[in-house]
């Protein structure tokens, strides 16, 4: 689940396709990363009609082709679905990472994204694209990048249908990888201690 706001750039048609697939709700929300924000997308609805996502996944595959990647890795849940479509379009091996919550964690990013042990040897030494559905705070991509490096893979590019805010660019810079996205939207997230919605007393959505 993620969130978004007004469109900034990219193909207008692609922007509109994504907005139609994932209408935005406004309110006060807490996200997987632990950040707070004002907009929410029900990502569970993204693959309600897979045929609507496939052209976007194929467009993303075309952008990733030039990065000489040898495998695709997508974080469960919806990111892995996009990754599987991209891997199929490029005829590349596909792997995934799965969310695991650390109940002892008290700060941001309490969820890690390990790669199943049976898949790690298939990724070792390979140039890998991390493919996701939507990136906002970047919890899933952040965790997947860390897991790929631990198993000896070489992440070279992040691919996503859309980014919300600046976190995706910051992740790409931090990990020295490229970023390919079909659309970009304005969005702001806050740590709980500085959330202006909390300061105004706006209740969190359940």
Name each model-derived stretch:
Residues 69-76, 159:
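Short glycine-rich phosphate-binding loop at a beta-alpha junction
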Residues 64, 86-87, 148, 172:
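A generic structural signal for well-ordered alpha-helical segments
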Residues 70, 126, 156:
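Conserved acidic residues
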Residues 83-129, 136-142, 197:
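Short, glycine/charge-rich flexible loops or terminal/linker lids adjacent to PRPP-binding catalytic cores
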